[in-house]
Amino acid sequence: QEILPESGGREVDQLARLVEAERDAALAPDAMRRMAALLPPIVPVAEAVAARLRLSRAQRDRLTCVARRDTEDARHPRGLAYSVGIECALDRLLLAGADTSPLKGWEVPVFPLKGGEIVARGVARGPEVARLLQAIERRWIDEHFPSRARVVEMLDESLHDG
């Protein structure tokens, strides 16, 4: 009986590429990352394997995060890391054969705008505040995490346009 019957030739080849990518990036081997390489990028498969192997919640979450990998992941590595965390972003980039150097030594920033600041500008509490926060946060990510001053400009622009 196989331990990972979900693995096929493509996944074994992917593991070989991952081992090489880890070496090239001077990263220590990582068992969970390597297990993720042996699974197809299908969330229910990752969940089933995690349950069958009785993995911890953190390990399950990591496998499912990696299973959500996408061909667009490498376009904005730091945006990916902001969304899914550095560990999962690193896993996904390595599996994609993408450059991981943008994440080296980088810390995930905190979005520098709060809903209360929008309310203080005269917007009523509720869905409009949430919509503005989400729109400005998307722009902040797309602009590669500019300063708080730029975020305030974005807010001003959004309030002026809205």
What are the functions of these language-model segments?
Residues Q1-A98:
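Conserved, hydrophobic alpha-helical core segments of structured domains
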Residues D91-G162:
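Charged substrate- and nucleic-acid-binding regions of tRNA-handling and nucleotidyl-transfer enzymes
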